[in-house]
Amino acid sequence: MSQKYLIRIAELERLLSEQAEALRQKDQQLSLVEETEAFLRSALTRAEEKIEEDEREIEHLRAQIEKLRRMLFGTRSEKLRREVELAEALLKQREQDSDRYSGREDDPQVPRQLRQSRHRRPLPAHLPREIHRLEPEESCCPECGGKLDYLGEVSAEQLELVSSALKVIRTERVKKACTKCDCIVEAPAPSRPIERGIAGPGLLARVLTGKYCEHLPLYRQSEIFARQGVELSRALLSNWVDACCQLMTPVNDALYRYIMNTRKIHTDDTPVKVLAPGQKKAKTGRIWTYVRDDRNVGSSSPPAVWFAYSPNRQGKHPEQHLRPFRGILQADAFTGYDRLFSAEREGGALTEVACWAHARRKIHDVYISSKSATAEEALKRISELYAIEDEIRGLPESERLAVRQQRSKVLLTSLHEWMVEKNGTLSKKSRLGEAFSYVLNQWDALCYYSDDGLAEADNNAAERALRAVCLGKKNFMFFGSDHGGERGALLYGLIGTCRLNGIDPEAYLRHILSVLPEWPSNRVDELLPWNVVLTNK
């Protein structure tokens, strides 16, 4: 009997051992399942993060493509589509009203360009007139043979272009001898812009204006002169530009002093390609602009712009340029300006004012690519701020400040509360989240204008000044050296200041190149564009 129990016990122990082994295997399988599940969860999380990152990258690339497509093929206006549609509808209504009131028929079967045209503006009165008088071929009446008496005239004007022509001015200085002694006298030689140079001030002004105002590279100008029968190499033209810049340096220095002697300056910069000596690849230099323009507050002080070149974008360059300045600096959020707003700056910190146009542009780019309702609402709120600025443009500082305190402040407070709320629901890595974060990080500098009637809501004055440089980059693509960048900055400043004051740059350059060789150094301020009286010669 005991033997049977022993066998039974052994059998039970075997079964128990098998069950324990089975449980152990199940535990291993369960552990493997848990590890697999954890691995899959981790892989899923990584995949979701990768998908989210890819979606952001796709959104960013689509936005970049759309932006480049607009720049290449479409308008660069930042008006909302509904605003454009409203303007087009209003324009169409005004055209219809104008046709109705003036008695012009609006035949839908006739193309617009073939219908009766509106009154054409007369040609400018200051242009010289060349009269071509045409007499009838008939000397007597073609019907009855009677005598023809003068009745009147039928006149029409046509605008014609007289191409520029080169000419040689030969100066003959008469020499005379004394009849009693050996003394000889002769007329003194007139001064020239370039000592012993063959170019007159008019030709030099044409070359300078051609390159830095009309964006014609020197090699193209050389080809133009060649078609007129005069060989002027690109190297020769480059030497002329350099000599003219040396001559006009005192005027450029006077322009710099004028701009620094104000309470508010707009600044911005743009990259330019520069050939580096001994290297095949061009390096990237920088053109900085500094604008004095207080016309929006009704100031009678002439607007002016000064440019500077630097071989890089280090913050020490604007620090050096703005060393004598004290006041308001309107700029973007470039970190290189930070030391200018520090209390440790020599002479005291400048007052930082940011640019709403720059902030708005970031939101607008998101709206164009995504048609986001949140972005559209932000643009609408910002447009309300600009509507107030349009109303007060040209008013004195005190009146501008009063309106901003009463109306703009309320809108800014509401906008800030709304953006903070919306930003909390946006991904920090999304483009709209980045745009909102930019605005909120710059909030104090963006809102400063509401507490100062002199400050502006944006930095568009500086951005407009840089357009000439950007157009030049598209045509001659690079400066030949750092020295070339410096002389380009000088000419962009003088020409840009002429444009701001409605002065013909070529006529101005011709004048100062004519008088500078003998001009007193203590009266150079009299040669600033707004101080010069130009003739129509």
Specify the residue positions occupied by each region the protein language model found.
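Short, flexible loop/hinge motifs at secondary-structure junctions
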Residues: 1-198, 266-267, 273, 297-299
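Short, positively charged, Gly/Tyr-enriched micro-motifs
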Residues: 62-64, 158-263, 495
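Mobile genetic element proteins and their domesticated derivatives, centered on retroelements
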Residues: 74, 141-144, 178, 207, ...
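Gly/Pro-rich turn-and-neighbor structural signature
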Residues: 120, 135-138, 142, 219-324, ...
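Short helix/loop capping segments that flank catalytic or ligand/cofactor-binding pockets
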Residues: 150-152, 186-189, 274-276, 298-300, ...
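Structured ligand/cofactor/substrate-binding pocket environments in proteins
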Residues: 201-205, 213-217, 235, 307-343, ...
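Conserved beta-strand -> loop -> alpha-helix junction used to position metal-binding or nucleic-acid-contacting
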Residues: 264-265, 333, 344-380
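Acidic/histidine-rich catalytic cores and adjacent linkers
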Residues: 326, 331-336, 372-537
